[in-house]
Amino acid sequence: MKNVTHSFVFLAHWPSAGSFGLNTDILATNLINLTVVVGVLIFFGKGVLKDLLDNRKQRILSTIRNSEELRRGTFEQLEKARIRLQKVELEADEYRMNGYSEIEREKENLINATSISLEQLEKSKNETLYFEKQRAMNQVRQRVFQQAVQGALGTLNSCLNTELHFRTIRANIGILGSMEWKR
């Protein structure tokens, strides 16, 4: 890593009398300088982005595992409900003479309650996955935006010098002065 940095420093200070060298003026860069800068950014930035994406991947996988556990629990509840349904059906056969319609209503209520519970759990799982995905995408967008803003600020700060500041201030004073004369 240190050798790579020293080689770039060496190239930047190489005499430019008709030979190859790095142009450090960002506004007058050529294709080779841009290629070197982009290459360095890709080389050093891909590790950070890869780590960020790996962390998000692990969180999403964890959420999926949790959802799968919820699904398994739901299936266990469904199996218990089926066993209970079988029990209710057996009792229905025994009490058919005494209250067939009441038992049938209880059976339908049990099936409906189980179905509603399953739908709610499935909906909850899908919403959790959707929100985790959205949160992951928003965090990645925010990180990329922050890095872009930091890079832009760094570029602007490196391009601005004292003379440019004074020219800008003088131009703005001239504009304000002409506005005062118009009143």
Curated annotation (Swiss-Prot):
GO CC terms, sorted: chloroplast thylakoid membrane; proton-transporting ATP synthase complex
Keyword terms, alphabetized: ATP synthesis, CF(0), Chloroplast, Hydrogen ion transport, Ion transport, Membrane, Plastid, Thylakoid, Transmembrane, Transmembrane helix, Transport
Keyword set includes Glycoprotein: no
Domain of life assignment: Eukaryota
Membrane topology, record value: Single-pass membrane protein
Compartments, as annotated in UniProt: Plastid, Chloroplast thylakoid membrane
GO molecular function list: proton-transporting ATP synthase activity, rotational mechanism
Matching InterPro entries: ATP_synth_b/b'su_bac/chlpt (IPR002146)
Segments passing through the bilayer: 27-49
Pfam entry (one): ATP-synt_B
Subunit structure: F-type ATPases have 2 components, F(1) - the catalytic core - and F(0) - the membrane proton channel. F(1) has five subunits: alpha(3), beta(3), gamma(1), delta(1), epsilon(1). F(0) has four main subunits: a(1), b(1), b'(1) and c(10-14). The alpha and beta chains form an alternating ring which encloses part of the gamma chain. F(1) is attached to F(0) by a central stalk formed by the gamma and epsilon chains, while a peripheral stalk is formed by the delta, b and b' chains.
Protein family per UniProt: Belongs to the ATPase B chain family.
PANTHER family attached to this UniProt entry: ATP SYNTHASE SUBUNIT B, CHLOROPLASTIC (PTHR34264:SF8)
Task of the protein: F(1)F(0) ATP synthase produces ATP from ADP in the presence of a proton or sodium gradient. F-type ATPases consist of two structural domains, F(1) containing the extramembraneous catalytic core and F(0) containing the membrane proton channel, linked together by a central stalk and a peripheral stalk. During catalysis, ATP synthesis in the catalytic domain of F(1) is coupled via a rotary mechanism of the central stalk subunits to proton translocation. Component of the F(0) channel, it forms part of the peripheral stalk, linking F(1) to F(0).
Note: In plastids the F-type ATPase is also known as CF(1)CF(0).
Name this polypeptide is given: ATP synthase subunit b, chloroplastic
Organism of origin: Brachypodium distachyon (Purple false brome)
Gene from which this protein is expressed: atpF
